[in-house]
């Protein structure tokens, strides 16, 4: 085994809880190692999440941007044009950030949802990832990761739910799930 060092493409997917949380843990570790991190949340809107306050403590070492409305209209034959526009804007910013080399780690939170809902082309994302600067790491999160995304990735983790408190009527807990 060689001692190869290069930026990784990491996918956190699957139906279980913890995809974004795992990405946040990796981001925190990266900041602790002196790296700069950008996290773009493709679908989350202006709702308040605890991690937003925590990230502010890192200044320009860890920047998080919410790029969506906070919800997506699903079930229609075609995605809502407003959702598509917001996803395209988020992707344009993400692609620019990745290619700039300004960030050591770029987290594309919930991008897999955007792709699976037909709001973004997986092939376009993969093509851009293939051109990224050598030492830039990218994490893509969300359920239903597209097969071409999985193929392009170096590491793929599938989260699966074994048991969840919600099934017993316990609502989401502040500081734990938001």
Regions found by a protein language model. Name each.
Residues 43-46, 70-71, 112-113, 144-147, ...:
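Conserved nucleotide-binding/hydrolysis micro-motifs of P-loop NTPases
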Residues 8-99:
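Conserved P-loop
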Residues 29, 54, 128, 148-149:
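Hydrophobic/aromatic ligand-binding patch that stacks against planar heteroaromatic rings
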Residues 74-137:
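Phosphate-binding/switch loop-helix module in NTP-utilizing enzymes
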Residues 8, 137-140:
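ASCE RecA-like P-loop NTPase motor cores
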Residues 143-178:
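Phosphate-binding/switch region of NTP-binding enzymes
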Residues 1-9:
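Extreme N-terminal, non-catalytic leader segments
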Residues 25-26, 52-55, 80, 120-124, ...:
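Short, glycine/charged-enriched secondary-structure capping and boundary segments
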């Amino acid at each position: 085994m060689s001692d190869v060092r290069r930026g990784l493409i990491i996918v956190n997917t699957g139906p279980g809880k913890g995809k974004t949380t795992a990405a946040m843990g990796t981001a925190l570790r990266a900041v602790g190692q002196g790296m700069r991190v950008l996290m773009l949340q493709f679908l989350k809107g202006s709702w308040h999440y605890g991690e937003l306050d925590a990230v502010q403590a890192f200044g320009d070492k860890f920047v998080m941007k919410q790029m969506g409305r906070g919800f997506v209209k699903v079930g229609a034959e075609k995605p809502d044009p407003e959702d598509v526009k917001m996803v395209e804007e988020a992707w344009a910013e993400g692609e620019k950030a990745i290619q700039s080399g300004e960030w050591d780690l770029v987290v594309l939170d919930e991008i897999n949802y955007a792709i699976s809902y037909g709001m973004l082309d997986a092939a376009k994302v993969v093509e851009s990832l293939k051109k990224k600067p050598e030492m830039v790491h990218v994490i893509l999160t969300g359920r239903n990761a597209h097969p071409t995304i999985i193929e392009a990735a170096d590491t793929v983790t599938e989260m699966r739910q074994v048991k969840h408190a919600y099934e017993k009527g316990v609502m989401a807990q502040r500081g734990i799930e938001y």
